[in-house]
């Protein structure tokens, strides 16, 4: 379908908007229907809440697991290096659509102060963009990437999908850069499966996010293998109580398939409270 840029683009925003990582190599680029490419799609950003495993896993509830990246695109993960994605509420607010004309410094494409925060002291939740699900940058829960060494996504499981990179205090600005472990080995010929992950810390419904990507590792000579992933545990920053080594993604507040328990009033996240230090996770190997 041919798209023209409308004078006023109706973007998902406010209470109806959320956040996902946009990059070439993502599933559901342009929406779930490969025959009807939508540059204004927000399909990957919608949260997962109280769903059976078969529906929340890989965003099967919206068909994203069956909408692979167009043109065989894949996210490059340089071993020991970094890769960059765009955190946004809508594909139109990224450089993937409309030549990036609606992309700004922030995920909603709008201007905000550098010290953006909610009202009051201490700050309440940010009111002018509830999709951020935070009070300010320091309270943003953190986002993560996980990888499975399977080119057939039907073979990806919680046990072989390993969190390999964590970016603290995100989502925040649109541009987000993640560190890659130096010992990640090469992927199979058909590539690997990756997931972008986020569990907000309050400021809205206690849901979670999981988006799908084809990915491949570059600049590597490593022959190491990933260890089997174990469920993370709440340790509240006490390293002696944390799960060590390779960890599964967080599955929380779903109808089935949950793998974590946290104290009343707490939220699990991709941060030190669940045993993840920021940056590349270099302890994930067998």
Curated annotation (Swiss-Prot):
Keywords: Copper, Disulfide bond, Glycoprotein, Metal-binding, Monooxygenase, Oxidoreductase, Secreted, Signal. Its cofactor is Cu(2+). GO terms for cellular component: extracellular region. Its EC number is 1.14.99.-. The lineage of its organism: Eukaryota, Fungi, Dikarya, Ascomycota, Pezizomycotina. InterPro entries: LPMO_AA14 (IPR054497). Disulfide bonds join 187-192, 194-215, 235-242. Lytic polysaccharide monooxygenase (LPMO) showing oxidase and peroxidase activities that are common for LPMOs. Catalysis by LPMOs requires the reduction of the active-site copper from Cu(II) to Cu(I) by a reducing agent and H(2)O(2) or O(2) as a cosubstrate. Shows no activity on cellulose-associated xylan or any other tested polysaccharide substrate, meaning that the substrate remains unknown. This is AA14 family lytic polysaccharide monooxygenase A. Pfam families: LPMO_AA14. Belongs to the polysaccharide monooxygenase AA14 family. Residues 1-17 form the signal peptide.
């Amino acid at each position: 379908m041919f798209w023209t840029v409308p004078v006023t683009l109706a973007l998902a925003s406010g209470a109806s908007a959320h956040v996902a990582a946009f990059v070439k190599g993502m599933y559901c680029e342009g929406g779930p229907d490969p025959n009807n490419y939508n540059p204004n799609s927000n399909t990957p950003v919608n949260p997962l809440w109280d769903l059976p495993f078969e529906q929340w896993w890989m965003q099967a509830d919206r068909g994203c697991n069956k909408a692979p990246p167009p043109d065989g695109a894949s996210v490059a993960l340089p071993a020991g290096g970094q890769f960059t994605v765009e955190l946004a509420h809508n594909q139109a607010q990224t450089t993937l659509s409309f030549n990036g004309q609606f992309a700004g410094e922030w995920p909603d494409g709008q201007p905000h102060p550098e010290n953006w925060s909610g009202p009051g002291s201490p700050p309440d939740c940010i009111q002018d963009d509830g999709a951020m699900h935070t009070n300010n940058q320091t309270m943003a829960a953190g986002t993560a990437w996980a990888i499975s060494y399977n080119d057939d996504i039907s073979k990806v499981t919680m046990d072989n999908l390993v969190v390999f990179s964590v970016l603290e205090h995100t989502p925040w600005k649109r541009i987000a850069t993640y560190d890659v472990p130096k010992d990640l080995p090469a992927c199979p010929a058909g590539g690997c499966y990756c997931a972008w992950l986020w569990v907000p810390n309050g400021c809205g419904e206690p849901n979670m996010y999981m988006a799908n990507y084809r990915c491949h590792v570059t600049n590597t000579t490593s022959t190491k293998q990933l260890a089997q992933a174990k469920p993370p545990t709440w340790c509240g920053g006490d390293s002696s109580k944390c799960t060590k080594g390779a960890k599964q993604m967080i599955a929380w507040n779903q109808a089935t398939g949950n793998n974590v328990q946290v104290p009343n009033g707490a939220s699990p996240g991709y941060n030190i409270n669940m045993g993840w230090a920021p940056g590349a996770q270099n302890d994930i190997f067998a």
